[in-house]
Amino acid sequence: MFKLGTIGLLSLAVLLRIAFFLFGVYQDEHFTVKYTDIDYQVFNDAAWFVAHRKSPYNRDTYRYTPLLSWLLLPNHMIPWFHFGKLIFVLCDLATGVLILQMLKKLKSKYRYGTDRMTIMAAIWLLNPMVITISTRGNAESVLCFLILSFLYCFLCEQYLLGGLLFGLSIHFKIYPIIYALPIAIYVAAAHYNKTQSVFKSSFKLFLVGFSTLIVLILLTVFMYMLYGDKFIDQTYLYHIYRTDHRHNFSVWNMLLYFNSALPKTSELSKFVFLPQMIIVLAISLTQLRRPSSFPLLCNVLFLETFAFVTFNKVCTSQYFIWYLIFLPFVLYNTRISMRRGIVMLVVWVATQALWLRQGYLLEFEGQNVFYPGLFCASVGFFVSNAWILGQFIEDTIIQNDYVYRIEPSESRSKDSAVIDKPAIAKTEKAE
């Protein structure tokens, strides 16, 4: 059987991205429907304003940190419109390299085998959805790189640097703040398991929290001094009151559509955060009931992100890679059978396809399919994602209650988890 080594995997990943990138440039020049994401045009225009000593928020619909517009300044200095895409592709590849490095680190710490590392890393590096999103000029790959960077620092017990990067990732896009509680539990419990003093354990937790807050405060104050209230409103507050109902998979899609016709004083869209936050908090707290380990942290972050995206009032295709970065770690020791995994994948793809069909009829054919077509498609996608989330929650419980056990050997640290072969056999028989 052909085995693709690390070098081969990375080489193939680079070649695929080059091919997608070049095809995108060709399509933009020769086809009516453009390959480049419309958001990339927004980033590019905002960078143009910055290059001319103006605010990036002079560009309508720019609702991101100014750092993103600064990142694309070379577009207007070289000048080359597509240069920013190369930055996003490099972040995409760097994320894949981090996945490989983290799996290698886990190999020594948690006795991970080498046979599945390449396969797990390929989930990101060879994923056509991931490649398409970065080569089209979507900036999510930058955020994914930041998230895995601070997780890698925590894995290596570099808590100061990890906290700084965590703060930067929250500034870049606010949703990673939901990771604060699981990270706090992991840092505190990991050192408690190592029988360190309460002072040392508390100091590590303080170090992470302090460094995170320092970065957030400094960046927020600095950007506010440069761009004023527009920065706060467009970067953060907008995502609370936004009512986007186009290109939106969310089950709240129809609610937002009708809400957009109501007076601006309507508070309706703010309440859709409530079920989302309750579920995310509940998932975070389940970590308290189990021994702390880095694999468990990755599982919890995956579940949090999956639930956050599923219940979010705005859900687009690029949001999916928010949880795809954790999938290699979740699937490494999954107890989900191959058959069930295929069913989950088919359901996830099929319900997306049904929604995209309705979206095509609406956007390109001009048909009024908001109800029942688009509404039913959104409900179907939501229900399928809720079922898939339940499967992964069950899998996480099985992994940590049966698959992992704390090794009593004095030769290894007490937080090191190993595969419990008898437990695996027992669960397989039970299934």
Swiss-Prot record:
It is an enzyme of class 2 (transferase). The chain crosses the membrane at residues 5-25, 80-100, 117-137, 142-162, 165-185, 205-225, 268-288, 291-311, 314-334, 342-362, 369-389. Keywords: Cell wall biogenesis/degradation, Endoplasmic reticulum, Glycosyltransferase, GPI-anchor biosynthesis, Membrane, Transferase, Transmembrane, Transmembrane helix. Pathway: Glycolipid biosynthesis; glycosylphosphatidylinositol-anchor biosynthesis. It is found in: Endoplasmic reticulum membrane. The keyword Glycosyltransferase applies. InterPro entries: PIG-M (IPR007704). Its EC number is 2.4.1.-. The keyword Transcription regulation does not apply. It is a multi-pass membrane protein. Residues 410-431 are annotated as: Disordered. GO terms for biological process: fungal-type cell wall organization; GPI anchor biosynthetic process. GO terms for molecular function: alpha-1,4-mannosyltransferase activity; glycolipid mannosyltransferase activity. One of its GO terms (cellular component) is glycosylphosphatidylinositol-mannosyltransferase I complex. It comes from the Eukaryota. Pfam families: Mannosyl_trans. Mannosyltransferase involved in glycosylphosphatidylinositol-anchor biosynthesis. Transfers the first alpha-1,4-mannose to GlcN-acyl-PI during GPI precursor assembly. Required for cell wall integrity. Belongs to the PIGM family. This is GPI mannosyltransferase 1. It comes from Candida glabrata (strain ATCC 2001 / BCRC 20586 / JCM 3761 / NBRC 0622 / NRRL Y-65 / CBS 138). The lineage of its organism: Eukaryota, Fungi, Dikarya, Ascomycota, Saccharomycotina.
